[in-house]
A protein has these predicted regions:
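Glycine-rich beta-alpha loop elements in corrinoid/cobalamin-binding modules
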Residues: 1-35, 251-253, 257
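Flexible glycine/acidic-rich beta-alpha junction loops that bind and position SAM and/or redox cofactors
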Residues: 80, 130-131, 187-192, 222-230, ...
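Bilobed periplasmic-binding protein-like "clamshell/Venus-flytrap" ligand-binding domains
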Residues: 217, 244-251, 309-316
Length: 336
């Protein structure tokens, strides 16, 4: 891009460039989807102040087992069509994996170079390909580092083999799995977000993960277009009774490029009739039962506090293992 500007070349030929014309944006030259992920080079982490990154300590998983974390992705793409998500738009709908050797080369080199103490896999669908995941787990077991899946995995992949899959993950060092449940109301899962997830598979999946010896964190989203206040309360109750060790209740964010984003514009669902800056903590669209974005944000804040303090009541030892000995309600909320 810089060379094109300096040399006065045609920038429209640069893949992925968005050029603004008037008040609208046009994607002039869509980038090609990388099919063979083994062609991707090792991320040049030596160009980053990794010690500064470790000192800040704001890793994807809020409570890590080490202060020297390596975030890594093994795959790209997602075959699902959830209406709130943009992963298929960014990475395509075909799920592709790097080879186990390619992944392990990155891990081993970075463990050596940066004295890594924990791995966090940021894949959208890490459990999507069980064969590849099991191959990876065999190698991770040799490395002996703790790891987790903070980006969330689909709940009902490989149900018949799920317990064995989770046991293999735990044996390879996975101390916590995050499950992307989103809602406990089947109407929302089917008709609003197209999740392709039977709600009655959520509890068994959580139970399988706990039987395998992993902590379970769950993701839930509230404030979908058309979701009623009563349905939100049903999801909260469903989550509280799920057996999950910890929770994140998020405010629906209408991500640009997602079907819900287009729905919000089409039906003018913004609180103030216009799109606002997204930071994943603010409420942008109208929500049933609430008169202002601030009121809904307070509701989500309080729900997260109640949800995550459940673990302290049920299992103080697990709570200390996850959050430490001196966590307060306010500091807990900064991490949810």
């Amino acid at each position: 891009f810089v060379n094109s500007i300096v040399n006065n070349n045609d920038v429209s030929k640069i893949p992925g460039l968005i050029k603004k014309i008037g008040e609208k944006k046009y994607l002039i030259n869509p980038p090609e989807i990388v099919k063979d992920l083994n062609v991707l080079p090792r991320p040049p982490r030596h160009l980053v102040n990794m010690e500064g990154y470790f000192d800040i300590g704001q890793f994807h998983s809020s409570k890590s087992r080490s202060n020297r974390v390596l975030n890594i992705m093994c795959s790209r793409g997602c075959p699902e069509k959830c209406t709130f998500c943009t992963t298929p738009e960014v990475y395509g709908q075909t799920h592709r994996w790097r080879s186990t050797a390619h992944i392990m080369e990155e891990i081993k080199n970075d463990v050596r170079d940066f004295k890594i103490g924990e791995l966090q896999f940021d894949d959208d669908t890490l459990t999507g390909n069980r064969k590849n995941l099991m191959s990876l787990c065999k190698e991770l077991e040799k490395v002996g580092l703790p790891w987790c899946t903070p980006n969330g995995t689909k709940v009902n992949y490989h149900l018949k083999h799920q317990l064995d899959m989770y046991k293999s993950m735990a044996a390879a060092g996975c101390y916590q799995i995050t499950l992307a449940c989103e809602s406990g109301v089947q109407r929302i899962l089917d008709d609003v977000i197209n999740k392709r997830l039977p709600a009655d598979t959520i509890y068994p999946s959580i139970e399988n993960a706990k039987k395998a010896g992993m902590l379970v964190h769950t993701f839930w989203i509230l404030g979908f277009p058309g979701e009623t206040y009563e349905e939100m309360q049903r999801t909260i109750k469903f989550a509280f009774n799920s057996g999950s060790d910890s929770f994140t209740f998020s405010i629906l964010q209408p991500l640009a490029g997602s079907p819900i984003y287009r729905q919000v514009w089409r039906n003018n669902l913004w609180w103030d009739a216009k799109e606002s800056y997204q930071n994943f903590r603010n409420s942008l669209i109208k929500v049933d039962g609430f008169s202002s974005p601030e009121e809904f944000e307070r509701f989500i804040h309080e729900t997260n506090i109640k949800a995550n303090l459940l673990l302290k009541e049920k299992d103080p030892d697990k709570f200390r293992l996850k959050y430490g000995d001196r966590v307060s309600q306010s500091s807990l909320m900064k991490q949810t």
